Amino acid sequence: MESSPSSPQPTQSDPLAVFPQRTLEPADIAVLVLYFLFVLAVGLWSTVKTRRDTVKGYFLAGGDMVWWPVGASLFASNVGSGHFVGLAGSGAAAGLSVTAYEFNGIFSVLMLAWIFLPIYIAGQVDMYAGAIFIQQSLHLNLYLAIVGLLAITALYTIAGGLAAVIYTDALQTLIMLIGALTLMGYSFAAVGGMEGLKEKYFLALASNRSGNSSCGLPREDAFHIFRDPLTSDLPWPGILFGMSIPSLWYWCTDQVIVQRTLAAKNLSHAKGGSLMAAYLKVLPLFIMVFPGMVSRVLFPDQVACADPEICQKVCSNPAGCSDIAYPKLVLELLPMGLRGLMMAVMVAALMSSLTSIFNSASTIFTMDLWNHLRPRASERELMIVGRVFVLLLVMVSILWIPVVQASQGGQLFIYIQSISSYLQPPVAVVFIMGCFWKRTNEKGAFSGLILGLLLGLIRLVLDFIYPQPRCDQPDERPAVVRDVHYLYFSMILSSVTLVTVSTVSWCTAPPTQEMVSRLTWFTRHDPIVLKEQVPSATPVPVTVSQNGTPEASSTNIQFEIVQENTSKTHSCDMTKKQSKVVKTILWLCGMESKGKEEPPSRADPVIVSLEEIPLVKTLLDINLIVCISCAIFLWGYFA
């Protein structure tokens, strides 16, 4: 195939090199350093701007975020470096059908804001992909690169909490969009626009493939989302139904996502943030999938390699090298300076995912586990535990890199989605039934979870025992693995869980009214009944501080915050003894000692009213209809 004049010329030294000797130039490194400094400055600025010395301030950003950083953080938390590598790789290998995951997410994130978030409020309730860029473009030691990245990420996550995470996510979203849109422009220019891509994609064959083999051929339905229900890689019934359940689980119940909407100052701002994220979810098709397809056109011998031995030499993966499509495009197509910008984009995608996971996991461990083990833990203790847990996650992340590197398949994104389809449906079905069917009880939910997860784990183990054969090998896997697509298995798993939960719930005692009050869609407007209004069978333990002041421990509905009972005198003595180094560390962690200690008082419950200003609510609802209409049009156009 003849390359266009604007196409990059193949490297003569080693035609099999995935990343030829081209590396980042000094200008690229300067852009990358400026990015790190800018992100660090924004992260540290947010630590000063927000209150970090309370549980609500650290884990929920004080519940005072407006819509645009919430929306940007939702998008940045979802779109990690695995999206850039995985979506582009799947686009190069099989066309744009993988875009269905992104279009599906549009509806799910809107359901979060309009359906699930009111229930949450009423109830008060990716490393390897980044390593590909860091290691290959800078030629650094893998662990050195990851340790440095994690250190910068952990610094502002530990210091600033969720506020720092959301503000830096907003910055990184802007950087990602600028860089990715720039690369998209260069990509389409290199192949002659969309028409040129449609023409050249089907001619993008590796020169080293066997003439009598179908391996490495572009799919005939590459430019369609809906595909054959029996023989395709993503059957259309599975896309419509099997894909929706894991999508609802991720967007409507995952701690990483929901925590951002709960940080909004009110329900209207949460809806606005979700709308912004929904509009941004249209972009991955154009900034990731299409560039991946362009990469196959420009570098067919490497991105579309079909011979296992050659693929092993090219990317150390005999199953295929489609996952190098995006990195290859960045390093070969962009001029000096812009390569540094795209490197910053990939690091931004990775760091936004890391900060989200670090903060959310720290929240779960501190508030759900540690607070249960130590119900009388002081607020300062909870702050320390949350930050120390982030450090532990950093160490686990470093140790986990080679495990992911060794286990990933030919298409990283598809590999991730298949695993999700085995484990997420039971959790999603149980959660949805609990929100919309008041008859669902604990025994039904437990039975459905156990059976569903057991079946999912069995399929997961079978997939590991019987991996998918290469194109040139016969498929001798058991029928349940060979013939049941993972999206169809998601539908089966959801149905089994639904029947189990319904049957067991009907055959056992229903939950009481108190158990479902303000915790389902139909009871979300029930009057609030505080725990303190219910007489306790045992007296509340009273603690006497050193200055003789009695202090009763109070429990918050969501966070169970126990006020610290250290005396004023002791606090003042500790302040005098603290060195400047200790004071600096305490300030970074949001635990600096105050000169005048405020008397212990009840922490304000984290409650956001369900009331909305009528005009704002109307504008949001109109925007919702417009967004859904756009999504339906895109589904129909590319179906």
Regions found by a protein language model. Give the residues of each.
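Membrane-embedded helix-loop-helix hairpins and adjacent transmembrane boundary segments
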Residues: M1-A639
